Amino acid sequence: MEHGGHELAVVVLVLLLLVSATSCTFLEEDVILGTVEEAKVARLGGGGGGGSKGANASTRRADNTCAGVGVGVGGGGGGGGGGGGGGRGRFYLGWKEEIAGMAGRPETAAWLRAVRRRIHERPELAYEEVETSRLVRDELDAMGVGFRHPVARTGVVANIGTGRPPVVALRADMDALPIQEAVEWEHKSKNPGKMHACGHDAHVAMLLGAAKILKAREHHLRGTVRLLFQPAEESGAGAKRMIEGGALEDVEAIFAVHVSHQHPTSVIGSRTGPLLAGCGFFKAVIHGGRRSGDAVLAAASTIISLQSIVSREADPLDSQVVSVAMVNGSDHPAATARAAAAEEEEEFVLGGTFRAFSNASFYQVRRRIEEVITAQARVHGCEAAVDFFENQSFYPPTVNDARMYAHVKAVAGELLGAGSYRDVPPMMGAEDFSFYSQVVPAGFYYIGVRNETLGSVHTGHSPYFMIDEDVLPTGAAFHAAIAERYLANHSPSSSSSSDSDDPDVELEAS
């Protein structure tokens, strides 16, 4: 080609680049605020570049980035002709990169660890979460987030966003367990006989992290995010009291996370429909003696007969549990014999738990437990009284709404990438998040903390329970993304708003 042709080609190429750089339009959420260095840590799960975990900003192409003007982020190379190092370039990064970048900053990760460790050192049982609640309020104050307290004694309810519908809620439980921690580390529980053995300290830290991200992105929220810091999940039905205190007023959907030792760190797991069982407890007192029946024999027959409820009556495709977990005939082995010899009334106590994945099955099992216990007592000439602890709310089954489940799965794929999500089987554990799921569409999901190198392999409620703290930034980012994307998809303006409602913000690199 002649020399003049080279000059003409260069001019045409420059014009094309200018047109490309100025003609791209972006949705209002496709904006990143911050520096180029901050953008480089927009990863929350394996890979090169910034080395943080998660979404890889360098892999985004024509969906939200104009080819030819992107610059490689996190060591992954650039998009189009602008890739690689050297020279100046412009970054058009979307909600994924901004949320991941904010959560992945070293100072954010350090703050999340510090918050979690402060809570872990001072565990508090149900409705005693005074210091934990104060920590939450102090952190929200520092962010400029308004809140309401007390709700359900020690609970905190905060709002971020427009203050108008739609309203989506995120929940974290705050209470610990009456367990003596056996893990020897710098931040071991300083409250004897109490331990965060179920990860609620991590739940609070992740929700506070989400609050910080959402507050920074408040101008992108097309509605309101409500944050529920709830007491008494382990016992006391704190969720029910939060609802009674107005925590779900105007809320149209709610989400919550629970750490899981069954999944690798930062992997999300959930399922549609029943996820966790409804849970109830029973206590039976069998009276015998005085020339009537033998309470011990009646109790033995009762325990055997209770096992037939599930094995002989339950639909094998509708999992149920009846378990006798406690028996007490006397304070001394000879007491029963003495009572029989003296023809005195004797007493035998037994108790346990029952579980099912639907309210119908739950109440059917409850009815049969009472029938079996009272009937077996009569067969042996005894009397029995059954207590189902009516003054304490049983935990209903936790059921994921199909749409909320789909939302969790979609956001996991978008934010964390392929392989970040797993469908999980239903479990016989129970959660008082179920009270929320009976009021509004709900999505409950797990986030993995399993790390065999660290020893994070023990189940919840174990004195050896621990977590991989690398999960904290991912959990905070995922919480924030769940809420922001829900509002983006469900706000009245979501289907009619312009792609350029907000001015674009560009990052420049030299």
UniProtKB/Swiss-Prot annotation:
It is an enzyme of class 3 (hydrolase). Coiled coil: none annotated. CDD domains: M20_IAA_Hyd (cd08017). InterPro entries: Amidohydrolase, Bact_exopeptidase_dim_dom, ILR1-like_Hyd, Peptidase_M20. Keywords: Hydrolase, Signal. GO terms for molecular function: hydrolase activity. Gene3D superfamilies: 3.30.70.360, Zn peptidases (3.40.630.10). GO terms for biological process: auxin metabolic process; jasmonic acid metabolic process. The keyword RNA-binding does not apply. It comes from the Eukaryota. Residues 499-510 have a biased composition (Acidic residues). Residues 490-510 are annotated as: Disordered. Its EC number is 3.5.1.-. Residues 1-24 form the signal peptide. NCBIfam families: amidohydrolases. PANTHER family: IAA-AMINO ACID HYDROLASE ILR1-LIKE 6, PEPTIDASE M20 FAMILY MEMBER. Hydrolyzes certain amino acid conjugates of the plant growth regulator indole-3-acetic acid (IAA). Belongs to the peptidase M20 family. This is IAA-amino acid hydrolase ILR1-like 6. It comes from Oryza sativa subsp. japonica.
